[in-house]
């Protein structure tokens, strides 16, 4: 899809306008379930959307043209920008949006950017969750000077000096930078793996550089100044996905490219990235402590009315506080919020239009907008998203995440690290279970989807509360390289997907080299309307060339079919019929046994859950049956297979699966009855 017209109408761009690319998608799961219905870049940090801090940082740097690369929830991002001050004639830069439906990683985004030929000179590459007041003027001058002297100096990474255990450093970040002390050239980069306590370097590096610094004390916010060679290199190297682990490492270890990457180490100022709930908490506290000045609450970046009081207390106008309530240090309260009698609030950020009852204790919590808390409640270090309602006499323990719209009944305890959501397709357990959300409550426990790591490591990487046993540290970007868009959304009408995207965790779907090639082959087959035999021949040739098995082939086909269904700009019913009747026979052609038919249904079940297509599983199962991708006995065996009821798959088996099996049994009984009557 071509980029949208500059939202504030600035069609004439300077010859060498300073450009910036903002990656609005995080390509990981860490903020779920908060990001099931809202992109991370629009989550509130001290009552201000994250992307505002990124835009202010770019304005401070003198950027004149911004491209916001959108994937999931693209419509929300575009709407927000259209209504923001950045769309006014007074904006210091023009804003353009690029919507990609296929982007699975930073690498995919930069390849698409390269294909559009929008970058005319050096540009700044940042994520939409960066909070920084580092001035880039001198950094840009240094970068340009290096480029004049050496065209191979293609990139400058801006990193911040801090201790290895600084609180704004993600718990899983332990990247090592080896830097030439004289030239600031980065000669080696290593994203450490869990349990790895050494750095592997080419000995030749020591012969080529007189003095080297091996540094593990740098916070990498992924603020990069890039030449326009960088997107082209991603295009030339299609396996590059992550900007650090793939691109930087690949460039530095390549004898052929001959390119150079430098580091600028910021020793003053502030730079951090909200890459996990742990850093969300830390950076929020830093904003209240004024480390990010001038980007502080009383600067009122939006249409706000904050005033600053002693002990780092911030209040907007129209806040109603009971005489006997106590507001302690490092607290922010949004407009139209009410706090009841004898309640104590400390180290807490409260959004607009919240109501807090009497005799409550709230410490180190985050309350977003329209939150209601009853009387006699205790709220620990937790996040309560928009429109959450907490009954009387409740306790929300440390680490709990209560997503938008969840209702907690009276006399309920939400245990430590529990995550609740109203999205049934991303939850486990019984809907509105009184033992979980209380009598009259609404919501279910969120079930963390596993990507490249096990669930425990996922929770470690994204948890709100810290634990000393997590300080062994592992790779900072383990889930950023190739994960599903964290802002993965529920399955919405297909016509609404033209300007939004549903990204997929490449680890979840075993997207190794074979699957990537298979997806490209199938996409060509779809677009060029190949015959089934030709498409099957191409897949078989690819399978033999890459030593893959037929299970991988069939899995790739199922994934490609579902992607195709999602991206057609027609109704769900039409999309299902069009894709399955045309391309379902390809899957049937490459299925050779009863066991493989069972495997097909298991694969379909898994992908429907991961892609939030659970409501269409029943229809898809019907097509599998009609097209003999899975015959009746295979579907019956799938239903009895323990694998079909593992974890998050159980709900789908017990709903659509049971309904289809019941239909099969009824049809068989009727058939037997008719035969008996004859």
Swiss-Prot record:
Residues modified to Phosphothreonine: 172, 503
Gene transcribed to yield this protein: tif225
Gene Ontology MF terms: guanyl-nucleotide exchange factor activity; translation initiation factor activity; translation initiation factor binding
Lineage of source species: Eukaryota, Fungi, Dikarya, Ascomycota, Taphrinomycotina
Gene Ontology CC, one term: cytosol
Keyword field contains Cytoplasm: yes
Function according to Swiss-Prot or TrEMBL: Acts as a component of the translation initiation factor 2B (eIF2B) complex, which catalyzes the exchange of GDP for GTP on the eukaryotic initiation factor 2 (eIF2) complex gamma subunit. Its guanine nucleotide exchange factor activity is repressed when bound to eIF2 complex phosphorylated on the alpha subunit, thereby limiting the amount of methionyl-initiator methionine tRNA available to the ribosome and consequently global translation is repressed.
Pfam families in alphabetical order: LbH_EIF2B, NTP_transferase, W2
Official protein name in the record: Translation initiation factor eIF2B subunit epsilon
Subunit (UniProt): Component of the translation initiation factor 2B (eIF2B) complex which is a heterodecamer of two sets of five different subunits: alpha, beta, gamma, delta and epsilon. Subunits alpha, beta and delta comprise a regulatory subcomplex and subunits epsilon and gamma comprise a catalytic subcomplex. Within the complex, the hexameric regulatory complex resides at the center, with the two heterodimeric catalytic subcomplexes bound on opposite sides.
GO biological process per UniProt: cytoplasmic translational initiation
Domain W2 intervals: 508-674
Species name: Schizosaccharomyces pombe (strain 972 / ATCC 24843)
Compartment annotation: Cytoplasm, Cytosol
InterPro entries registered for this protein in UniProt: ARM-type_fold (IPR016024), eIF-2B_epsilon_N (IPR035543), eIF2B_epsilon (IPR051956), NTP_transferase_dom (IPR005835), Nucleotide-diphossugar_trans (IPR029044), Trimer_LpxA-like_sf (IPR011004), W2_domain (IPR003307), W2_eIF2B_epsilon (IPR044123)
Keywords: Cytoplasm, Initiation factor, Phosphoprotein, Protein biosynthesis
Principal cellular location given in the protein's record: cytoplasm
